Amino acid sequence: MLKSQIYSNRRKALRELMGNGIIFFPGNVEAPMNYPANTYHFRQDSNFLYFFGLNRADLAGIIDLDKGTDILFGDEPSMDDIIWMGPQPSMKERASLVNVSDTRSLSQLATYLSDAIHAGRKIHFVPPYRADTAQWISILLGIKPMFLKVYASLELMKAIVQLREIKKAEEIEEIEKMISVASLMHTTAMRMAKPGVIERQIFGRMEGIAFEYANGTSFPTILSI
């Protein structure tokens, strides 16, 4: 994670580019492989990460443009979480890492958004790319999944692009770190590409490097020898 002030500065910059209403950033949920507790490697939504920074499932972020406040919705660690993973930080502790003071349980999100809709407030969101997120937004906002792209906020999309296309020094530093990792992955693959070596061996080594030095690859490795 970056410094907490960076995330609050990003949210402040987004407010300055937007009009009024509420910006809704749904985080990603775990995706099961073959039963609920056996999940694929978790990947947080990039926009949620950019503005709220927490790489954890089952969270949602709100930026209230009219009140100038930020809210993080998420549940406290369960007893199962503590048994399997040991002591876990509270929602307040997690939120403090990204300069958010207002935290609420995920069960309160539906009422919060419903009250905003009934008050005539605009809810800004970007088009979802995952089916589970589309279903969640559909239920929360009362919009059929097929119409979510129609109701998605073009104003928000343009504002996010305007912010994210300009990289600050700390972002460039992180990008350069990942360039070094990518270089190691590619040069390792080149050295291994010899007669008798099969693709899965090279693939496995490349994936291992990605997880050793970072958080895995941003897209599946494309490899042919």
Model-derived segments and spans:
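Active-site cores enriched in adjacent His and Asp/Glu residues with nearby glycine-rich loops
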Residues: 19-36, 176-225
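A composition/biophysics-driven feature that prefers long, compositionally simple stretches
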Residues: 1-184
